[in-house]
């Protein structure tokens, strides 16, 4: 276990604490196993990644166990690893959302439309219905980036069955 790290980002500290307190497995008197503690780390990581901490990973969370205080009991402390690069703890917001719809045959003239979800650049002529993008894109400009919304957007676009490639990029 690495040395204890002072968490400079109190928002991250509060989020981890609130997620951990709500986890049904982390209760006083519970029996702990390595697999179960690993699952807790994954649940906390998933929750953080859906709240803007895109690069957060389960191995950033470490457990420190003390079995000396009382016989047959263990005091456990959860903390962040000491060697996490600061960039990995950065919180991200969704920026401008720009969607490109290209023609199968290539070519065409680009036409730009503002939708509720962002800017749509569509190569014309095209029979693609612009309102489909509002239904498929779940990300919102200015909100905390959520992996769940990114996955939902990709799934909805793929289900349309009209795209040969779906690419989500950070700029």
Write out the residue ranges for each language-model feature:
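Periplasmic polypeptide-binding modules associated with outer-membrane biogenesis and secretion
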Residues: 1-171
């Amino acid at each position: 276990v690495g040395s204890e790290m002072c968490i400079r980002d109190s928002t991250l500290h509060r989020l981890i604490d609130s997620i951990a307190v709500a986890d049904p497995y982390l209760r006083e008197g519970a029996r702990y196993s390595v697999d179960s503690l690993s699952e807790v780390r994954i649940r906390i990581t998933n929750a953080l990644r859906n709240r803007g901490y895109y690069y957060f990973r389960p191995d950033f969370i470490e457990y420190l166990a003390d079995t000396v205080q009382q016989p047959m009991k263990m005091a456990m402390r959860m903390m962040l690893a000491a060697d996490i690069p600061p960039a990995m703890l950065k919180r991200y917001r969704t920026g401008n959302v720009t969607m490109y719809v290209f023609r199968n045959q290539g070519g065409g003239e680009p036409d730009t439309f503002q939708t509720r979800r962002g800017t749509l650049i569509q190569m014309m002529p095209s029979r693609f219905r612009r309102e489909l993008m509002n239904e498929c894109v779940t990300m919102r400009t200015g909100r905390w980036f959520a992996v769940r919304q990114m996955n939902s957007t990709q799934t909805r676009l793929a289900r349309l069955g009209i795209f040969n490639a779906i690419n989500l990029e950070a700029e």
